[in-house]
Amino acid sequence: MVQCLVVDDDPRILNYIASHLQTEHIDAFTQPSGEAALKLLEKQRVDIAVVDIMMDGMDGFQLCNTLKNDYDIPVIMLTARDALSDKERAFISGTDDYVTKPFEVKELIFRIRAVLRRYNINSNSEMTIGNLTLNQSYLELQVSNKTMTLPNKEFQLLFMLAARPKQIFTREQIIEKIWGYDYEGDERTVDVHIKRLRQRLKKLNATLTIETVRGQGYKVENHV
């Protein structure tokens, strides 16, 4: 079941969204502030976050930035502020979508599912290659009795490569699949994610490795 974090300082909004999410078989974890949301994430995995902008303490822009950079969680901003400058700031903060109040909760649910589809590459939740098992539902890697949870983007990148062993993916193909057509950042972010994945695979003693194909891109090899 999808786990959705909802952050708003209005308890009526929290209850309204949570009740409708439950009817759509989406688990809702409601929090009244950015600080409380981050505390929850220390012990609870979520798949997506719906975040209000106007909150005391940590506002929605700050929370969105933290969720994207530290947890790699897709974010939808929900707010009464509909000025173009606010929308621009929201997308600069990293939000994946933006919904203004008042809103139709069914539209919010449609948008939640649409964002999740962009983040999910393969409907198969589990895959094994060599001694490594990848569980997409929990973003986990497992080798024997060792288990490791990855940030969403790292996991989806590895899952995509592992699903097609020996196939070479260019940086452009990876960005298009993992970050989307509208990504405007540096393509070298792919190299950073690959470096982290190599470190994680080495730590797990996985037989899977990510190889660099000079001048072309990256591919996965399984050394059994």
From Swiss-Prot:
Pfam family, one: Response_reg
DNA-binding region: 124-222
UniProt keyword annotations, A-Z: Activator, Cytoplasm, DNA-binding, Phosphoprotein, Transcription, Transcription regulation, Two-component regulatory system, Virulence
Keyword field contains Kinase: no
Main location class: cytoplasm
TM helices/strands, residue ranges: none
GO terms of molecular function: phosphorelay response regulator activity; transcription cis-regulatory region binding
Post-translational modification: Phosphorylated by HssS.
Subcellular location(s) per record: Cytoplasm
GO biological process, one term: regulation of DNA-templated transcription
CDD domains the record matches: REC_OmpR, trans_reg_C
GO CC terms in record: cytosol; protein-DNA complex
Protein name in the entry: Heme response regulator HssR
Organism: Staphylococcus aureus (strain MRSA252)
